[in-house]
Amino acid sequence: MALELNQSAEYYYEENEMNYTHDYSQYEVICIKEEVRQFAKVFLPAFFTVAFVTGLAGNSVVVAIYAYYKKQRTKTDVYILNLAVADLLLLITLPFWAVNAVHGWILGKMMCKVTSALYTVNFVSGMQFLACISIDRYWAITKAPSQSGAGRPCWIICCCVWMAAILLSIPQLVFYTVNQNARCTPIFPHHLGTSLKASIQMLEIGIGFVVPFLIMGVCYASTARALIKMPNIKKSRPLRVLLAVVVVFIVTQLPYNVVKFCQAIDAIYLLITSCDMSKRMDVAIQVTESIALFHSCLNPILYVFMGASFKNYIMKVAKKYGSWRRQRQNVEEIPFDSEGPTEPTSSFTI
């Protein structure tokens, strides 16, 4: 994968263009990419560490609150819970890709396939659950909801999202392997043409970005118009939240998908004709995909922590934890001779 993170970014190459010297068929000389490899060894582990720590903390809190404390869940709650689970599973793969960037893949062929597929499943499903949240918010504002809780259709939608993401990860399970240079990378048979490889790339862009972006754009624009028309309510805060959600999605996802689209076009028309351009493309995919996955760290803030109800649950949990700590400290501070009558003992001096 181009970024040592995204399993789908290099379907049209037989070797990892970031970590290896790649000989384009149109080139007369070999393109040496040592500086690209050195950049990846420094940038990817550092960025992944920050994303892993911050994202793991935020999404773990979301899962814990929704799973153990919030018993009455709405459809949005169910989507947010699934989104947090997807983000957690995505973040769990980052340490493996950080090690791969520095030392190569050391966990074997099967783990290479599973980790690559796990990344794709959760990256794609996360984008789809964002679209589901936007639809439910639009419906809640503009239509009279038929029921307040999450019913069977909501869970069916969640299952469909997961199944679609799993189907999209099949190429990772089939083509990813550990090559002779100990890197987890896709290897394609020669009979598979570049058009098929580019088609897989375009399918991922469509399902993982274009469709969610269009749904979110339409739903949140309609929601904003409905909020503006509503009398006697404070509109500024909800509108700011909607704007923040859309802006963060565009800033984090658009650059990566533009670069990914350029790679797909290059697979068909061979637009990259110089080594320097190829190196710049490698660095661009590393940086933009890292920014794209950082969205999983921001989801708890955008979709959960801004909500008043979730803040109340956090306060309740904090109070329970504080009460438990105080009780434990009080027990530890009680002296051994402070309770109950003492048995009479004989006293003497030596």
From Swiss-Prot:
It comes from Mus musculus. It is a multi-pass membrane protein. This is Atypical chemokine receptor 4. Glycans are attached at N6, N19. The gene is Ackr4. The keyword Isomerase does not apply. Belongs to the G-protein coupled receptor 1 family. Atypical chemokine receptor subfamily. Residues 1-41, 100-114, 176-199, 262-289 are extracellular. It is found in: Early endosome; Recycling endosome; Cell membrane. Pfam families: 7tm_1. GO terms for molecular function: chemokine binding; chemokine receptor activity; scavenger receptor activity. One of its GO terms (biological process) is chemotaxis. Expressed in lung, heart, spleen, skeletal muscle, testis, astrocytes and microglia. Expressed by cortical thymic epithelial cells. SUPFAM superfamilies: Family A G protein-coupled receptor-like.
